[in-house]
């Protein structure tokens, strides 16, 4: 469909721009101009990918090694270049498909995650009414 505005994660736009999803998706992504709201204020929400160790994990030593590896430059470069997500450590730049947007990104560190949950039912209702599935 067509729209003047859309909400999307930057990694989806970068994936489309990469051509991995085909020429049609790449052409569509080239018509999009990303923007991050609230950059002069609180910043913009950022999704995170997290990892942890279960209390009853039978192999805590190797779990710790995995977590430590995931925050190395090597692992972060792999993540950045294969998922188009933002790096979690300083010194690793976002993928060039993200950087080419020419935008700085200020993350919203003020809004508690629980605030998003409070609005989940209303957001789901709006999406359903709009025909999103």
Model region roles, listed by residue range:
Residues 1, 16-19, 56, 69-76, ...:
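Structured segments of extracytoplasmic/periplasmic soluble domains
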Residues 6, 43, 59-63, 72, ...:
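Solvent-exposed, acidic/flexible segments
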Residues 10-14, 39-42, 58, 72, ...:
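Solvent-exposed loop/turn segments at secondary-structure junctions
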């Amino acid at each position: 469909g067509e729209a003047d505005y859309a909400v999307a994660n930057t990694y989806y736009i970068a994936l489309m721009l990469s051509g991995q999803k085909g020429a049609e998706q790449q052409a569509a992504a080239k018509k999009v101009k990303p923007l991050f709201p609230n950059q002069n204020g609180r910043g913009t929400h950022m999704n995170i990918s997290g990892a942890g160790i279960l209390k009853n994990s039978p192999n805590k030593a190797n779990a710790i090694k995995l977590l430590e590896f995931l925050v190395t430059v090597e692992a972060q470069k792999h993540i950045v270049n294969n998922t188009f997500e933002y790096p979690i450590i300083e010194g690793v730049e976002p993928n060039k498909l993200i950087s080419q947007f020419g935008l700085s990104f200020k993350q919203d560190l003020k809004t508690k995650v629980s605030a998003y949950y409070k609005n989940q039912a209303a957001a789901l209702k709006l999406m359903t009414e709009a025909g999103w599935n």
